[in-house]
Amino acid sequence: MGSADDRRFEVLRAIVADFVATKEPIGSKTLVERHNLGVSSATVRNDMAVLEAEGYITQPHTSSGRVPTEKGYREFVDRIDNVKPLSSSERRAILNFLESGVDLDDVLRRAVRLLAQLTRQVAIVQYPTLSTSSVRHLEVVALTPARLLLVVITDTGRVDQRIVELGDAIDEHELSKLRDMLGQAMEGKPLAQASIAVSDLASHLNGSDRLGDAVGRAATVLVETLVEHTEERLLLGGTANLTRNTADFGGSLRSVLEALEEQVVVLRLLAAQQEAGKVTVRIGHETEAEQMAGASVVSTAYGSSGKVYGGMGVVGPTRMDYPGTIANVAAVALYIGEVLGSR
């Protein structure tokens, strides 16, 4: 890339930085005064004319300065050389706050609240999906001799409870054997494999006695409820942050809020996050969702030991502090994974 192209990118970078900070269209005189561009105002005007002709900036009003377009923001984001890492005190504060969570729900609620505060955008965190989880522990509790409570705890800390109605009452000895058999079949296995194992166990016993019947009924509940009908859940925080930037959405705020409420679009975007530590930025129409055309989504995956638990990120206007947002999303995702992986 030639020096003229490099210089024009520095002009674009300055326009993005100033517009994000001030919300005001930026003129050539302002750029020369605020930034050490090393060229005259006339040269900056010429560079801005080229940037506008190529679609990187636009003039919103006849006598105003220029503002970045989606293409301009994309060029800016693609050429971020390095993201300034958070300070050690900031990282420690994030980790301490998340570690104080008493369980999975509390950790994720804290994460979404923290990310919304750090970025001043809407924060979104996807619950760990059962399809990517393994069974850490299975507990069987007798509510009555003929009514059981199954408690499945995954390696991500997710807890699911289901009731099983038995055909015949079982005694303490049979309950203990049932607990051992189901645990041996499922614990330590991914959910899909655990469901196959518990189904095979039920088929082998084939309801031959009271214990076999109990295993069959428990297996049916575990397979049908916990595996085949997994629920995608999403936590949102900081929705009010969007309403403070209504003008940035150019009349599209309502559709963005509707997309967040419906969750389908956001879940699709988060589902595309398959690699923890890699942050993806989608600007405006890059979200491929008409409702989100006025917004940007900065997202990543969180997980532990190379395993992805779910996606997370922020939604905000295209006029966004991209370097700061990327750094905060990456940091919170890293520490969610650390906290959940250590439990």
UniProtKB/Swiss-Prot annotation:
<keyword id="KW-0804">Transcription</keyword>
<dbReference type="InterPro" id="IPR002571">
    <property type="entry name" value="HrcA"/>
</dbReference>
<dbReference type="InterPro" id="IPR029016">
    <property type="entry name" value="GAF-like_dom_sf"/>
</dbReference>
<dbReference type="GO" id="GO:0003677">
    <property type="term" value="F:DNA binding"/>
</dbReference>
<comment type="function">
    <text>Negative regulator of class I heat shock genes (grpE-dnaK-dnaJ and groELS operons). Prevents heat-shock induction of these operons.</text>
</comment>
<comment type="similarity">
    <text>Belongs to the HrcA family.</text>
</comment>
<keyword id="KW-0678">Repressor</keyword>
<dbReference type="InterPro" id="IPR036388">
    <property type="entry name" value="WH-like_DNA-bd_sf"/>
</dbReference>
<dbReference type="InterPro" id="IPR036390">
    <property type="entry name" value="WH_DNA-bd_sf"/>
</dbReference>
<dbReference type="InterPro" id="IPR021153">
    <property type="entry name" value="HrcA_C"/>
</dbReference>
<dbReference type="GO" id="GO:0045892">
    <property type="term" value="P:negative regulation of DNA-templated transcription"/>
</dbReference>
<keyword id="KW-0805">Transcription regulation</keyword>
<keyword id="KW-0346">Stress response</keyword>
<protein>
    <recommendedName>
        <fullName>Heat-inducible transcription repressor HrcA</fullName>
    </recommendedName>
</protein>
<dbReference type="Pfam" id="PF01628">
    <property type="entry name" value="HrcA"/>
</dbReference>
<dbReference type="InterPro" id="IPR023120">
    <property type="entry name" value="WHTH_transcript_rep_HrcA_IDD"/>
</dbReference>
